[in-house]
Each structure stands twice: as C-alpha cells, then as structure tokens.
Design a protein with these regions (language model features):
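Chalcogenol-based redox active-site neighborhoods
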Residues: 1-156
Length: 156
C-alpha cells in the first residue's frame, strides 16, 4: 500500500477509449488528482463524479487534472461520461491489481458485513510523481470540495 511521500506507481491503464495511459499522459502543471470509486452509474459514484465535474475548472486553475479509476469497462465508462457530461478521463483496472497496490482495494465493512471491494480513495500527486495527500474511506458527497479546499490552502 502506498503512503504519502511515496513515488506514485506508473502502470499503463486503459481509458474510456481503450487507450493505455500512464501518469505522464495525465498530469497537469502541478499534478494529478486520482479518485478511485466503486462503480459507474451508482448513486454515490455519480454524486462524486459530478462534483468533480462541477469543480474541474477550479482544479485546473490550481494546476491539477482530475482522473477517475474503477473496475468498469471502457464501454461502461463511455456511457457514464456521456450521460453525466464528464470532461475528464476515466481509467479501468479490471483485475484490481493497481487499486490493491494503492490500498484502494481490499477488505471493507459495509452495513455490518465484511466483504472485499473498492475502498473509495483519492490520491493527490505532484508534477514530479510524489504522492502529496491520500484520502481513504471517503464519503462521496462533498469530497471533491474538500480536496479542492485542501489544495487551495496548500497552494501559495
């Protein structure tokens, strides 16, 4: 599991168009905000995605690109992007190996049951590829604003 201060791993993962993308393809002037979510088109994930969409111009003003990551297929991502007018890249980790390496896949407790699945997480990575901040087990609603506020407070 990665920690703050670690170098961000740089695998090639397919985007919504099926094109393999790496960190250098996605990073903006100051860095990247990668949010890991369970599933396209579910209520919480839609809330999270549309909040990032609505705040994207503010993230760009701070020099950050926003990218989503889930197990969903490129086809599912395309439908999700189209339905909700999402202007950012969604990556696919079908076998969850990258999410597991990040610590965003594993055992979780929900409604009193223990299961294995996506642990909703966000990673703020600077331009040099170093993880500046990790948010784990986040609530979808309001999370994008919290990340933006934290980045704004940290930017001189």
């Amino acid at each position: 599991m990665v920690q703050e201060g670690d170098r961000f791993p740089d695998p090639k993962l397919p985007d919504q168009g099926g094109i393999a993308r790496c960190f250098d393809d996605l990073v903006a002037a100051n860095g990247l905000v990668l949010y890991v979510y369970p599933r396209d088109a579910t209520p919480g994930c839609t809330t999270q995605a549309t909040e990032f969409r609505d705040l994207l111009a503010d993230f760009h003003r701070l020099g950050y690109e926003v990218v989503g990551l889930s197990r969903d297929s490129a086809e599912s991502h395309c439908k999700f992007i189209t339905k909700h007018d999402l202007p950012f890249t969604l990556l696919t980790d079908a076998d969850t190996s990258f999410m597991a390496h990040l610590g965003a896949w594993g055992e979780k407790k929900m409604y009193g049951r223990v299961s294995e699945g996506v642990i909703r997480s966000t990673f703020v990575v600077n331009r040099e590829g170093v993880i500046r901040k990790i948010y784990r087990n986040v609530r979808a609603k309001g999370h994008a604003r919290r990340v933006l506020d934290d980045l704004g407070a940290a930017t001189p």
